[in-house]
Swiss-Prot record:
It holds the Pfam family I-set. It is a lipid-anchor; GPI-anchor. It is found in: Cell membrane. Belongs to the immunoglobulin superfamily. IgLON family. A lipid is attached at N322 (GPI-anchor amidated asparagine). Keywords: Cell adhesion, Cell membrane, Disulfide bond, Glycoprotein, GPI-anchor, Immunoglobulin domain, Lipoprotein, Membrane, Repeat, Signal. Binds opioids in the presence of acidic lipids; probably involved in cell contact. It comes from the Eukaryota. One of its GO terms (cellular component) is plasma membrane. It comes from Bos taurus. Residues 323-345 form a propeptide. The keyword Cytoplasm does not apply. This is Opioid-binding protein/cell adhesion molecule.
Length: 345
């Protein structure tokens, strides 16, 4: 906002110097108010970035000259504009008020502004501080992440704003009040569990505007766990269904065995159907030879598990507890059985 650049004639620079010497506060001299009531003290002005700021100076008929300065730079002297900034305009120049406006305010406009007046006796000044508030904005946040259960995870969320925003992390995939909250730019999770997967929300808030909110998804991989495998009783000639339900990330692949034989759709009138985390083995016309123990095997890249399920006829005495266990196995998962054995533990 300087005035003694190449765009101005040398005589204008002389005028500026004269103004500073005659009635404006020289650079380096402390600001003083003259008397306690004139010019009237001004409150600080607070505006949001992009808004307009109005700086008002209350004067009276004792004033012979008046000017607005930003630090040591003259913006206006009377009705004469000295600032080259098109955003700075004069609003009011009357015997009782001298006001300017700064349009589309930005953070570099923040700072002290001085209304300097000349009376018959001596110069007097009044200072106002312009405060520019900036809504919160998240500038950098972690990408979605996939980890194995038991690993450590660190999420980052960096935000800017004026005043400096408060950054809060919250786990969205749990009931309200049950998920942990971290008031920090970094969210650190040690020995992560499968129930800590889901969306995490970063919120940046400074009360200037609505909070800026971004989300990060954490996927936790874990080996299969068979959560449901129920023995089924059915009469000869009826339809029988064995069901096996497994939880796993990535999703488990299923195989069915009877003793050492891997079963497949179409074999002896059976059908295997896999839908998501559930696999079913259907017998459309149960015969005596179909009765017995079947093994459901669920696998993914992290591990393998199995459960024993029994198809039985009327009057059979069956242990009500199904055998579900982790297991080791040598299998061709997408082809024919190469070798098959289980070690339960």
């Amino acid at each position: 906002m300087g005035v003694c650049g190449s765009l101005f004639q040398p005589w204008k620079c002389l005028v500026v110097v004269s103004l500073r010497l005659l009635f404006l506060v020289p650079t380096g001299v402390p600001v003083r108010s003259g008397d306690a009531t004139f010019p009237k003290a001004m409150d600080n002005v607070t505006v949001r970035q992009g808004e307009s700021a109005t700086l008002r100076c209350t004067i009276d008929d004792r004033v012979t000259r008046v000017a607005w300065l930003n630090r040591s730079t003259i913006l206006y002297a009377g009705n004469d504009k000295w600032s080259i900034d098109p955003r700075v305009i004069i609003l009011v120049n009357t015997p009782t008020q001298y006001s300017i406006m700064i349009q589309n305010v930005d953070v570099y406009d923040e700072g002290p502004y001085t209304c300097s007046v000349q009376t018959d006796n001596h110069p007097k000044t009044s200072r106002v501080h312009l405060i520019v508030q900036v809504p919160p904005q998240i500038m950098n946040i972690s990408s979605d992440v996939t980890v194995n259960e038991g690993s450590s995870v660190t999420l980052l969320c960096l935000a800017i704003g004026r005043p400096e925003p408060t950054v809060t992390w919250r786990h969205l995939s749990v009931k309200e009040g049950q998920g942990f909250v971290s008031e920090d730019e970094y969210l650190e999770i040690s020995d992560i569990k499968r129930d800590q997967s889901g969306e995490y929300e970063c919120s940046a808030l400074n009360d200037v505007a609505a909070p800026d909110v971004r989300k990060v998804k954490i996927t936790v991989n874990y080996p299969p766990y068979i959560s449901k495998a129920k023995n089924t009783g059915v009469s000869v000639g009826q339809k029988g269904i064995l069901s096996c339900e497994a939880s796993a990330v990535p999703m488990a692949e299923f195989q069915w065995f009877k003793e050492d034989t891997r079963l497949a759709t179409g074999l002896d009138g059976m059908r295997i159907e896999n839908k998501g985390h559930i696999s079913t083995l259907t017998f459309f016309n149960v015969s005596e030879k179909d009765y017995g123990n079947y093994t459901c095997v669920a696998t993914n890249k992290l591990g393998i598990t199995n459960a024993s399920i029994t198809l039985y006829g009327p009057g059979a005495v069956i242990d009500g507890v199904n055998s579900a266990s982790r297991a080791l196995a040598c299998l061709w998962l997408s082809g024919t059985l190469f070798a098959h054995f289980f070690i339960k533990f």
